[in-house]
């Protein structure tokens, strides 16, 4: 009489059966953790380089029970409006967290399978620069995913609200170093990230850099062997098209590998430096043609913008696409003594320009891997840990709040944050 079972219960059973086959107990969705070591080694026959990675000590986990969380204000939606993102308080410790609640009843089986892959990867990965999931469980007909609240938001939030003409080079170096460390780990684990962009780079209260967007990760290991290339086109990828490499976009028999993420790092570097992503607002077909024809985005500064244009004051209503061409004539006006200086009248180091050029090589085989890039001269300027230097480099930006010492009875400070929280594109963090 299975037809009498409610849809939420059917979904719960479907998810339960599916996750048990793939290692449900490792995912701990229902809070049932048997004694002993139950962490399943995914892809057991994978390469030695994958097996050699040790698991560093990470943030402690939270209890997988809905009653342990006091949901406060809604700070975002996403996943085709099936996901609600709440600021919440974890009652046992008083820590403020982000709770992503996904309505499983409205999800298709394909969506649930998609989420299953994300949660499996979140349990498999353990790295200081990959956003940790503090708890994952099912409450009623909802999947709850709990993560720490990232008080600086994403790198996209920062350039969208404070650094609209781009960040300074040293801040970018710290951010990209954290991203490359995460990618080096992900690639050694046999995965391609496929969604590196500023909105998937989260920065915590103490200035630590985390790569998110695990939902798009794809394993390159099949039947115990690492494949030379994969051919799967990322699902729900409309938001990441400007960051995708030419070989991913063209979808041919040659496929792509982890070097496609390196191209995305180059695009993200331009995004952070210029204040907007290259190919912004360009139709998808034109974007593909530009990339296949070898159009290379660049950093906008005195070495890439003609001197005569640097004497003009650009209208902020029209952004330069960052494609190594001149600014649109309609976006310029003569500069006089009262006009502000050109926002791109700055000079990035030759090391930074070379770093971007290396990442954006049209031929993926010519791009360095993440490990090699971490030794690039661009990162020689880093002298301190990101947690020590980044908060200073992001000034005058301050974390939205650190929530320390807040009492559950007094939420006046919390609800006073709503205006600031609305500026964050939390639905695009994808945690």
Curated annotation (Swiss-Prot):
The keyword Acyltransferase does not apply. The modification Phosphothreonine is found at residue 419. Residues 32-52, 314-344 are annotated as: Disordered. It is found in: Nucleus; Cytoplasm. GO terms for biological process: activation of protein kinase activity; G1 to G0 transition; protein export from nucleus. InterPro entries: Kinase-like_dom_sf (IPR011009), Prot_kinase_dom (IPR000719), STRAD_A/B-like (IPR047173). This is STE20-related kinase adapter protein alpha.
């Amino acid at each position: 009489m299975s037809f009498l079972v409610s849809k939420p219960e059917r979904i719960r059973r479907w998810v339960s059966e599916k996750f048990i086959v793939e290692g449900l107990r490792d995912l701990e969705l229902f809070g049932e953790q048997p004694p002993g070591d139950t962490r399943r080694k995914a892809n057991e026959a994978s390469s030695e380089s994958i097996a050699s990675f040790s698991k560093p000590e990470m943030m402690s986990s939270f209890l997988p029970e809905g009653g342990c969380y006091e949901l406060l204000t809604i700070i975002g939606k996403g996943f085709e409006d099936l996901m609600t993102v709440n600021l919440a308080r974890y009652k046992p410790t008083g820590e403020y967290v982000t709770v992503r609640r996904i309505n499983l009843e409205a999800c298709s089986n394909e969506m649930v399978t998609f989420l299953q892959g994300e949660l499996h990867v979140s349990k498999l990965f353990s790295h200081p620069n990959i956003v940790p999931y503090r708890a994952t469980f099912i409450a009623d007909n909802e999947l709850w995913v709990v993560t720490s609240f990232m008080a600086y938001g994403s790198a996209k939030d920062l350039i969208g609200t404070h650094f609209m003409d781009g960040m300074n080079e040293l801040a970018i170096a710290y951010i990209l170093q954290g991203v490359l460390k995460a990618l080096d780990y992900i690639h050694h684990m046999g995965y391609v990230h496929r969604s590196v962009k500023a909105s998937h780079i989260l920065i915590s209260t103490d200035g630590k850099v985390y790569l998110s967007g695990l939902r798009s990760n794809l394993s390159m290991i099949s039947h115990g062997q690492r494949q030379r290339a994969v051919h799967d086109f990322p699902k729900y990828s409309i938001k990441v098209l400007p960051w995708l490499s030419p070989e991913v976009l063209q979808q041919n028999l040659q496929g792509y590998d982890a070097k496609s993420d390196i191209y995305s790092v180059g695009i993200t570097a331009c995004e952070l430096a210029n204040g907007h992503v290259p190919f912004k607002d360009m139709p998808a077909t034109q974007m593909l043609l530009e990339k296949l024809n070898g159009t290379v985005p660049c950093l906008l500064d005195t070495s890439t913008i003609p001197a005569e244009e640097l004497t003009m004051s650009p209208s902020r209503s029209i952004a330069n696409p960052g494609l190594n061409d001149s600014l649109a004539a309609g976006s310029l006006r003569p500069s006089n003594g009262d006009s502000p200086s050109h926002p791109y009248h700055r000079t990035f180091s030759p090391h930074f320009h070379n770093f971007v050029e290396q990442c954006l090589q049209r031929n993926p085989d010519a791009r360095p891997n993440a490990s090699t890039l971490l030794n690039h001269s661009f990162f020689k300027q880093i002298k301190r840990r990101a947690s020590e230097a980044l908060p200073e480099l992001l000034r005058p930006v301050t974390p939205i709040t650190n929530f320390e010492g807040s009492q559950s009875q007094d939420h006046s400070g919390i609800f006073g944050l709503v205006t600031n929280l609305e500026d964050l594109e939390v639905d695009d963090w994808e945690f």
